[in-house]
Structure formats: C-alpha cells, structure tokens
Amino acid sequence: MVEWITKINGMVNGIVWGPIGLALLFCTGLWMTLRTGGFQFRRVGHWMRHTIGAVFTNKEVTAHTSKEDMAISQFQSMCTALAGTIGTGNIVGVATAIVSGGPGAIFWMWVMAILGMMTSFSENVLGVYYRRKNEKGEWSGGAMYYLTDGLGAKKGCKTLGKVLAVLFACFCILASFGIGNMSQINSIAGNMNAAFHTPYLVTGVALMVVTALIVLGGLKRVAAVTEKLVPIMALFYIVGAVVIVVLHAGNIPAAFRAIFRGAFNLQAAGGGTLGYGISQSLTWGFKRGAFSNEAGLGSAVMVNSSANVKEPVQQGMWGVFEIFADTIVVCTITALVILTTGVVDIESGSVLAGVQDNALVGQAFTAAFGSFGPKFIAISLLFFAYSTVLGWSHYGTKAVEYLFGQKGTRVYKVIFVGMVVVGATMKLGLAWDLSDTFNGLMMIPNLLAVLALSGTVVQITKNYLDRKVNGKDIPPMWSVFAEYQKAEEAEAAEEAEQAREAEALAELEILGGHAVNE
C-alpha cells in the first residue's frame, strides 16, 4: 500500500513540480507581465512608495484599528504573508538549487521571481476584489472565492469553478499540516538538537504551547505576532549574512560571474549532454524559486484579502513587494554567502570538503563566526520556519472556513496545534513528500483562475492607474459585490469629508493665531 501511494505521489509530483507545472507557472507570470504592460518594471517607483515606503509615511498602512474592526493592517497582512513564504526554502532551498543546478540556478530563481511578481500581484488583486464578509464580520478571500464567483460566473463554468475551489481548499488543508506545519517544526527540532542539544520532545512541546496561545487567538493575534517577528528575523539573518559577504567582498564579482555564466552554460552542474547544464540550472532555479516565494500557489492571498484596504491594486502591490523581499533580497543574500565563502566550487556548484547540501549555509557561517555559526543558523531557521507555521495556520483556517464554516475552524486549529509535537518527534518521510505534492496541486486551479480572469485584473489595474496616476474622475473598481462596493464608497466619502473638515479647522486655527499676534 505504501509503495503504491509513493509511486502515485511521485508521478503526480513530477507533473505539478515538473516541466508541465513549472511551464504553467512561468507562462502565467509572463502573460500577466505582458497584459499589465510590465507593471513591476514601469511602476517600480510607485509600488515601492505605496508599500514599504508607505510604512514610514502613511499611518493607514500600519493602522490596527479602523471601521473594519475585524480587519488587519496592510503591514500586518504583508508580514503574515511573508511569514508564510519566508522559511527553510530561503536557506536550505537556495543551497539545494546551487548544488543541483549550479550557481546559474540563482539567475533562474530571479527570473521566476520577477515574473512571479505579477502572478502574485494578479492573485492578490483578485483576492480583494472577490472577497466577502464571514459571519464574524471578517474579510474572507482567496482562490476559493475567485474560482467560485469569478471563474464560476463565466458562461458554462459554474460547476467547474466550484469543483476547482473545493479541490484547492482540500489541497490547502492537507498542505498546511505538512509543509505548513510538521516539516517546518521537524527542521526546527533537528537544528535545535544539533546546535544546542535540545531534546526533540522538549522543542515540540514548547512550540506547541506557543502555537496554541497564538493560533487559537485568531488572525488578529497571529498578525500581531508576525508584525513583530518578521522584521526582527529578517534583520537578524540579513545582518549576519551581509557581514559574511562583506568579509569575502573580494569574491563577490566572481560569484556574480558564476551566476550569469552558469545560467547559460551548456554543460554546467555535472556535465552531461549538450544543453544539460542550462536544463538543470533552469529547472532547479524555477523549482526552488517557486517553492520559496509561493507566487502562484494562492496561499498568501488568503491573508492579504483580510487587510484593511479598499484598493485591490494596493494589496496587489504588496504581493509584488513580498516576492521582491523573499527572493530578490533574502535568497540572493543566502546565495552570496554560499558562493563567496568557498564551501562550494564557484564554477560548478559542487560541494567541497564533503559537506552535505543542507548544511552548506551553516558551514559558510561557521567559516566566518566559528562555533557560533551553527547556532546562528539554528536561530535563523527557528524564526523562519516557525513564522511559516503561523502563516500557514491562517491559510488552512480559511480553507476550512470555506468548506465547513466557522465551526469547522475550531476543530482544525486544535488539530493543527497537536501536529506540532508530531512534527518534532517523528520521521516524516512519505508524509512530507505528500504535502509537497499537495502544495503544488494548489497551484493548478489557482493559475487557471488567474489566467481566466486576467482581463478583470487588467481592468482593475487600468481603473486604479487612471484615478491615482492620471487623475481621472471615474468610479473605482473595489469589489465585484454591489453591497460591498457601495459601503466602501460611502466610507470613502465620509473619510474625505472628515479630512476636509480637519483641513478647514487647521486653517481657522492658523488664522486665529495670526489674529492674536496682530
């Protein structure tokens, strides 16, 4: 029975994470890039100003309270989404890509990330546009909803949209227990045991208690934790990695040469027949890139749709920034750490000194920090992997809510918390392989929806740019549902009136001050 399941899983995994699935992912990103006129390139200043730049200039981006009492801030949604995507793939996954595909794999990770920015943009635009309120007054959005109300609204596609939505939700729930929970916890427990000799059970119980306190408190509590955890963990790892790269600054030019040359080297990473090198570097770069940033999987949409935001494009731009931060920043820094410290052959990517690929980054940090190196990586993986658990707890919750309603989410959360100990103390084997497949299976219905609704994404984006950039006075496209659209417009009108009153009051105070002085 186990052998049969393993064989079937291997076949399915070879499709979703093989040439067919990766080609679909690549083509979707390319198609959305073309249809939006290269938004991630032409509007780079705009989306930077309205995402990370707005954190320091716009209080609405970080505001925790508004009339949407059950919503979370845009910054919180971004941190929770990054919590779900930044994980072991940013450390171990990069090392695997380099060893298996050569340094050139990093170039193809960048390509997948750049195109994936528009896939992420599109799915988040659709997530906000098709979201709806649940019985608690929370926003619920994600691929399930734009499959049902978007794809399902097209002629003859009602049943197809519903079936794909149910399949997506089922795959998401199963993946949340594996890649979103047990495999991350297993990685944490293994690294804590190796670095600090902490027993697996102790790590599991401790993390189970912490997870229960956070996850059972709902999205607000998860977002409150990730809002603080993600910036801290990113800064901690990036600073340590940058120190290593600076110490080996003389090797940086050679590292970039190896990346670009390896991307187009016909016989890189193991030699073989003509074109083998490009095939390997491209395949591993695409695969690890997709696994790292999750663009196209539809996972992060479920938390981004819960944000306190009216504009679908605003949340879409956060999706672009999330891919930029995950792959272009964190994965690139990890790659430079590996390539500049000499733990791999910089030309071929083959491991030196008999170091296993999953310990490459630790070896690089050991070369710079001595015995503290493995401890640094253990702490980094603790942050990265555990933040993934928190992010995926919300994804699974929303999938269960779609299928069974609010009552089902309570049962799910209890099971999710219990799985933490299982992940810490058991060898996962087939369970991990299955969850990897379920993770990939989420991608298929989501990408089909993005492609089918690409025209809607283009319309919403054009509407936004016409209003915000070109200054046209036209009705906004905020929601597909008339009742939500009207409510948002009424709230926007009220906010505009309050802003005018505040401005008038400020002018009166200034005039009054002048009168007193005279």
Residues covered by each model-derived region:
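N-terminal alpha-helical transmembrane segments of multi-pass membrane transport
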Residues: 1-84, 88, 99-105, 116, ...
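Transmembrane helix-loop junctions in multi-pass membrane proteins
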Residues: 4-5, 35-40, 90-94, 176-189, ...
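Membrane-interface loop-to-helix entry segments
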Residues: 24-49, 164, 168, 185-192, ...
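Helix-loop-helix module between adjacent transmembrane segments
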Residues: 32-33, 112-137, 148-186, 190-214, ...
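Flexible loop linkers connecting adjacent transmembrane helices
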Residues: 38-72, 96-106, 110, 118-159, ...
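Alpha-helical membrane segments and immediately flanking helix-loop junctions
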Residues: 59-98, 126-129, 135-151, 173, ...
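Selective recognition of specific alpha-helical transmembrane segments in multi-pass small-molecule
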Residues: 115-123, 204-219, 230-250, 283, ...
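Extracellular/periplasmic helix-exit of transmembrane alpha-helices
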Residues: 123-136, 242-258, 266, 270-276, ...
